[in-house]
Amino acid sequence: MTTIAANRECIAADTRVTTGSSFYHAPKLFRIGTSIIGTAGDGFACLAFVEWFRSPRRNPHVLQKIFQDHDRDSIWIVELNPGGILFWNGWGYPERILDDFFAVGSGGQAALEAMRHGLTPEEAVLRATAHDECSGAPVQVEWLLPPELTRRRKRGK
């Protein structure tokens, strides 16, 4: 499957894509406007969601069709934007995540535990790849702001 982990500053995902007993690497994070979308699950449904999100119209009927045409547990979307973290559930509705970090996918529990112990989303996904054969390195990372600006802001400079 996949591992996606996010905090309020960055989002990370493994790049392993599995098809039966084969695997290859592909991006799972997509920057669209001020949002970064992380996709997990059925590849066709995930890419259909990304295209829907890129559309200036974002027709809600098209979104419902994307989710209806697939098993509700086969598409997981995490959105990181300046307002926080959203999880698009299997019904196609975004849920705001109130915690400081979030993880989803087959390695999601391992990534959550790693972040509870202070690891970054990138480190958490890398740790999850060691425990989950369906997730694999390299890890893709996207920041809302350039990392240098984020670190300066944290130090109060």
Model features per residue range: what roles?
Residues M1-I75, L80-G83, W91-E123, P146-R152:
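Conserved short S/T/G-enriched processing/targeting/catalytic segments and their helical context
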Residues L126-R155:
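Charged phosphate-binding loop/patch that engages nucleotide di/tri-phosphates or the phosphate backbone
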